[in-house]
Amino acid sequence: MKIRIIFLIFCLLIAQLVFAQEDKPVITAQRISSSIKFDGHLDEDVWRQALPATNFKQREPDNGKPATERTEVRILYDRDNLYIGVLCFDSQPDEIIANSLIRDSDLEGDDQITIVIDTYLDHRTGFVFATNPNGARFDAFQYAPEREPNENWNGVWDVRAQVTPEGWQAEILIPFKTLRFHNRKEQIWGINFRRVIQRKNEEDLWSGYAYNEGITYLSSAGELHGLFDLKRGHQVEFFPYGKFGIQRQDSNNPSQNVLRKTGFNIKYGVTPTLTADFTVNTDFAQVEADQERINLTRFSLYYPEKREFFLEGADIFRFGRFYSGQVFYSRRIGLSEDGQQIPILSGARLTGRAGKYSIGLLDVQTDSKGATPGANFLVARLRRDLFRQSKVGFIATQKLVPGTGYVNRAFGADLNLYFTHFLGDKNLAIDGYIAGTKTPGLHGNNLAWRIFIDYPNDLFDNYFYSYEVQDNFNPEIGFVRRKNIRRTGGAFRYTPRPGILGIRKLVFKPIDLDYTTDISGRVETIDYELRPLGFITQSGEFFEFNLQRTFERLEEDFNIFENHVIPVGDYWFNHTEIQFETNQRRMLSGALFLNWGDFYNGKRTVFDIESLMKWSTHLFISLNFRYNDIHLADGSFRTQEWGSRIGYAFSTRLDTRAFIQWNNEDQQLNLNFRLHWIPSLGSHFYLVYNHLWGTGNRMLQSENQVFVVKADYLFRW
């Protein structure tokens, strides 16, 4: 009987793949033989002659109705570039909102246009380009509809934009060398356009405007025709860099060092769809410092990757999730456990596609530093497309310490099934993996597995998962938050749209349960959350009220902070939570998090606030503050974490940013300042100043200063 049920479900899913075909809107690109003036003015004859994409429909607030303002998109191309011209008509041009100028700044609070291009027409991956009326550039790489785009991908492209009496317009230039596509005489690409009108909190799309779709759902995108004889060729990019600086230690043994370093990166197009990258003497002086956090849990904190060499192509290497065992975590390469840099001598990477296969190879050699020996890191990833949007893949990693014979290996297989027309117009995702490791001295109990079922839709948004991480599962180039556990959980969310009292969507969550045991079945952690009320307003504000109940079993004393210890035992505690967030289009926006109630053998109140002030198009200031007031059986303590970012943009190519942070655990004030100039596309100049002060005696005491000037230049053939 069970086999019959499984067979029927499988047939139903396959039927969705076979019959889920629909007519797609088409835009045709026009080839031009003469050059155009790239200035943001779409007044040349070739622009007027190109047929536009129109008929945008609302996704929000009135789903399926025509957009309240007209949008026209035209596409031209020549031998080297793709040109996209966008006319965003607006009946109230004085009300257009555009605050951002800085490259890769968050455009969510601005009027904007977003373009997604699926060059492989695989309905899975796409290049994302977005801009606002100021011509600020944002780009990303879309990996799959169920995942957020990789916002750290940075392509070489340009945009000019301006506000006009009729609205605003943008002219976008994308070199074909920035994209990857098949070597064919005629190209047909997937493409979609999204416009946001902030003052109306309106989202318009050319295609895929249903609530259960959106700009990231490439299976719902339209198509771009008319592209012939595109030559990407064997692209070669050469990025030499030079760095000069001074480091001064102001501690008990003052010292001063001159910093000099040169190196280069090379990018080579092996085929039109496969790219090789090489790096020598890699440097990341311009990368912003991590936001330091006080860890009040028993497990390691996860920090995101920020280094550009490891960000490009990161989606191909992705395997697993950090909370359930991540086989590859690039921060294990070139960074120590406490975030200090370890020199990278050289590295090579191959990423791209070959037919239905996605390929990723990475080989990096690090130098020794202090007690950390040099090591070689190798990662191999292979993934094959299945059906319309699904895929199956394999991964292998190796860490080798030369001269010692020490080798750590990890390997795994994963399957991702995604259906965007399940039961008609619903989304369903099923994914899972199994992985194992081989470590000298560890035998058996070295596996991890996971299954995840997600039903991410507008009215009902539900998921279920189960995973296991055995005690000897040890991917040394990966991340494992917790071992020797089995964890099962899920959530059920109901999100109706009442259309009254200024409420766009209500969010009810009667079930959100995580149940964790050790491998033997002994309960370790239970987390349950009930959301009796949550809502999103028509103006874009968000509110939620949650009731939570937690169980924790401590099998050893837990030193939570300084000399405060929670003893072995079983603990049940209840707590209440409120979250509120305003729309980022406002001059002053922010978010509030408040949680209070039981905490092990005492009480805790958590207060977290984030604010963003957009003083003008050029200047922004953000502030975040997190405060814990904890009372335990052995005494009380408070934690404080402060952080502030200040940014000033002189133009879209010249900006400064400062990041200041402090917490009362490290008792250090950390300043990270960066000036960034883009003299030409792909080339950069940085001026970086870092200063660390100790504050333990309630006075500022300088401990470390670094001043660096760095420049790189792009040569492209």
Give the positions of each predicted feature.
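Positively charged n-region of N-terminal signal peptides that target proteins for export
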Residues: 1-5
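Structural preference for beta-rich elements and adjacent junctions enriched in aromatics
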Residues: 21-385, 393-394
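Structural beta-strand/beta-sheet cores of well-ordered domains, especially the beta-sheet scaffolds
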Residues: 25, 69-73, 80-82, 111-113, ...
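Catalytic-domain carbohydrate-binding cleft regions of carbohydrate-active enzymes
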Residues: 253-257, 261, 265, 275, ...
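Exposed, low-structure sequence patches enriched in small/polar residues
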Residues: 343, 421-717
